[in-house]
Amino acid sequence: DQTRILNVFDQIPPQLSRDNKKFQLSKVASGARFKDYRGCIEWLKDAGIVNVCYCLNFPELPLKGNYDETKYKLYFADTGLLVAMLDEEAQVDLRANKNLGVYKGALYENIVGEALVKSGCGLYYYKRDDSTLEEDFFVRTANNLVPVEVKATNSKSKSLSTLINSEKYSDITYGLKLINGNVGCVNNIYTFPYFCAFLVKKYLSQRK
C-alpha cells in the first residue's frame, strides 16, 4: 500500500550510505517480511523510480535464474532523486565536491547503476556472507562474465583480482574498474572514468 511504498522509498538513501548496501526490510519496519513488501518494490521498479540490483548465487553464467530475489540493493533510477533526498548542507557540499562522507560511494554506485540500466544491462552484484569477497556489478558478453567495480577512491581492487585470477570463476577472464582517473589496463583490469559508464556495454560488445 501507499504507506509501505513510501517507507521503502525513504529508506533507500540511508541504506545506500552503509558499507553493506544490501536493502534490509528490518530497517523499514520491525518484523517486515519480503513477501509483504515484494509488491511495493515491484511498484517502485515498474514506475521507473528504482533499479533493483540482485545478488548472484555464484559469479557465473547465466545471470538470469542465478540470483536470490530476496537479496538485493535498491538504487534510484534517476541519481537526481538521491541528491534531492540529501539534506541541504549535503547538497551544498556535493556541488562543491567536498565532504561527501558516507554518501560518496553511494552516489558513484547509483550513477553507474543508472548508466548500465539505460544502456540495456540488468543489475547484479555478488557478496559472500562468509568472506570479504564482493563485487558491485556484473555485465555479461556472449562468452564472458565481466565484473564491474566502482571505486570512490583509487584504491586496490582485491575482490576484482580474485575473481579474475581464481580458477573457481571460469567465466571471468577480465574486469572493469570505474574510477576518478584515466583509461588504462593493468593485470586484466581495465579502468575507465566514471563518465564512461554508459559506454561499458558498447565497449564490451566491440572487444575482441
Q: Language-model features: where?
A:
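Structural signal for conserved beta-strand scaffold positions within catalytic alpha/beta enzyme cores
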Residues: 51-52, 76, 125, 149, ...
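Short, solvent-exposed amphipathic alpha-helical segments in soluble enzyme
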Residues: 90, 164-167
